[in-house]
Amino acid sequence: FMMAIGEFKVVKDTYKKPDGTLMEVNYYVEPEWEGDAKAIFGETPAMIAYFSKLLGVEYPWDKYHQIVVRDYVSGAMENTGAVIFGDYVYKNKRELLDENDQSTIAHELFHHWFGDLVTAESWSNLTLNESFANYSQYLWDEYRYGKDEAAYQAEIVEKNYYESAKAKGYHNLVWFDYETREDMFDAHSYNKGGRILHMLRSYLGDEAFFKGIQLYLTKNQFKAAEFHQLRLAFEEVCGEDLNWFFNQWYLGSAHPILDIKQKINASTNTIEITLEQSQNLELAPIFKLPMHVAIYDSLGKHIYPIVFDKINQSFTFPFNGGVNCVIVDDQQMLL
């Protein structure tokens, strides 16, 4: 429940639903920001349309308002149909050329499916809310600005997880032995969880990934869910046992660290790539890592799928002429 009282100007916008009806999308701002409100929040109707189509579940509420308040300590909050933002979002049109808050706007909107429509059944499962909201930022960047910009922003998200984990320690994504619920609001639940979803998307492919999400949302709407419900939805769609993925990423800690060596055999026109998992095995498991290796030779680029699931493993690939470049995890699947 949220109540906002103040001298707001209400800047009105709309979202056109698939049936042609219009839904209110209003922006509540202080009077001096009335002229900038649509510049700040104006992508919101397009976000609602895109996310509704992508998820296969129409925005499930009857309005979407965004209210800017002062002295708010939590950045923003996904109150159903009435999201609040701190006054940091106030930027004029010139300032918005340098920095906008579309990632936060997308994040809070996505919570209306993940958090509001389907709610994590416990603080331990908070990542079911926050990882999806975090990943929405990638999805919007990918749609609005292209894959390169999305990948660039994803690198920042991933780096923030590494730095946070190094400073504060590692824990499971689904974390049962936290001390206080505030401990759950960290770069594991948000950043790491978002990148794990991207790994799963890369592994399953877009069709199965988004159908799995649609099934998860429709089966669990207006209910509380835990991460096993998410796994079961993906398994039903793809027909594959995904316990290995969820066990290592949701119930396991830390992340893989890979050492890579290569050896070219000119007499057989082959290259041997040796991979080693060098993470601390007291903190992390030996990961099963599906990925792709790209070999660039005189005839162009050749992509080979592999599964690396041992401490040390070698893979041999053919080449033509000479090897110009080798890229392990060519599709940037891995955390």
Where would I find each of the regions flagged by the language model?
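Second-shell loop/turn segments in exported
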Residues: 29-39, 122-123, 183-186, 199, ...
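Active-site-adjacent bridging/hinge elements
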Residues: 19-24, 82, 106-112, 163-176
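Amphipathic alpha-helical substructures
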Residues: 178-182, 186-273
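Short acidic/polar inter-strand loop motif in beta-rich domains
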Residues: 330-335
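Hydrophobic helix-coil surface modules that form long, contiguous segments used
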Residues: 1-106, 135-138
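Beta-strand-rich binding/interaction modules
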Residues: 242-243, 253-328
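Acidic/His/Gly-enriched intrinsically disordered linker/tail segments
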Residues: 98, 130-195, 199, 220-222
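Catalytic Zn2+-binding segment of zinc metalloproteases
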Residues: 109-124
